[in-house]
């Protein structure tokens, strides 16, 4: 009997210059209402998918990075400007992907704020 393969989730920026995937289930999917995240997406909230860094990889392209505050990096497509991910020193083994970049966002609905 073969082992079941982990589920693969894919995502991309608007122009498709950056594509990524992660294996398995995310650790969490949540909304953030802090000022920094709201400004980063010009919206009332930002929705993130938290995954272990070891589950994640870029398939195509590399994002640009902006350090929005000490220890906080925000990744975005240098071509179309789509916000792609967030990484912070508080979560050194995680990457927080923007929910809107998922190919099928309904696959992982938000579960909290």
Predicted segments with their positions:
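A short Gly-Trp-Pro
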Residues: 1-113
């Amino acid at each position: 009997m073969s082992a079941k393969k982990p589920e693969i989730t894919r995502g991309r920026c608007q122009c498709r210059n950056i594509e990524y995937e992660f294996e398995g289930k995310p650790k969490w999917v949540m909304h953030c209402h802090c000022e920094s995240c709201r400004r980063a997406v010009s919206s009332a909230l930002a929705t993130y998918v938290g995954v272990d860094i070891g589950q994640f990889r870029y398939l195509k392209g590399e994002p640009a990075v902006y350090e929005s505050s000490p220890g906080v990096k925000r990744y975005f497509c240098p071509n179309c400007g789509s916000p792609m991910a967030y990484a912070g020193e508080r979560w050194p083994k995680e990457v927080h992907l923007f929910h809107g970049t998922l190919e099928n966002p309904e696959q992982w609905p938000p579960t909290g704020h």
